[in-house]
Swiss-Prot record:
Chain's gene name: moaC
Top-level EC class: lyase
Pfam families: MoaC
EC number of the protein: 4.6.1.17
Catalytic activity line of the entry: (8S)-3',8-cyclo-7,8-dihydroguanosine 5'-triphosphate = cyclic pyranopterin phosphate + diphosphate
Protein known as: Cyclic pyranopterin monophosphate synthase
Lineage of producing organism: Bacteria, Bacillati, Bacillota, Bacilli, Bacillales
Protein purpose: Catalyzes the conversion of (8S)-3',8-cyclo-7,8-dihydroguanosine 5'-triphosphate to cyclic pyranopterin monophosphate (cPMP).
Annotated organism of origin: Staphylococcus saprophyticus subsp. saprophyticus (strain ATCC 15305 / DSM 20229 / NCIMB 8711 / NCTC 7292 / S-41)
Amino acid sequence: MSEFTHINHQGNAKMVDVSEKNISKRTAIAHSSITVNSEIYKQIVEHTNQKGNVLNTAQIAGIMAAKNTADIIPMCHQLPLTGIDVTFDWQENEQSYTLNIQTIVSTTGKTGVEMEALTAATAVALTVYDMTKALDKSMVIGETYLLSKSGGKSGHYQRQDN
């Protein structure tokens, strides 16, 4: 079993020293979702929400969240992100609609951007909830997970669907 890298010799939390790691291009792709009712779906796609364009605002929130991940996740390094993209795909269910969210975050650096991609995806879903909760508070934010990552010593990871 490998040692935990975020624990020092006294058993306390520490931020890992990455100064000896090689610089490489690193990319992470994350997924989240939010399921809404037909009234909220209609409001989002027709841009009639009183707070503004829901998806544009959520995209900006995701970008801001990725850029500020180190401020809210204690052991994350501040990274010079080189790219952040947020995309959406609607899935119609029997009596609801699911907004699938994908975030892609890239950097050229000494540590990966998985947490930035996951934080962005989560912030997007939370922003959609915040902007539409006046209509229905029973929305469900779905699973959030890492789809893939590339770069670094551990190489490529691709999530396998079960």
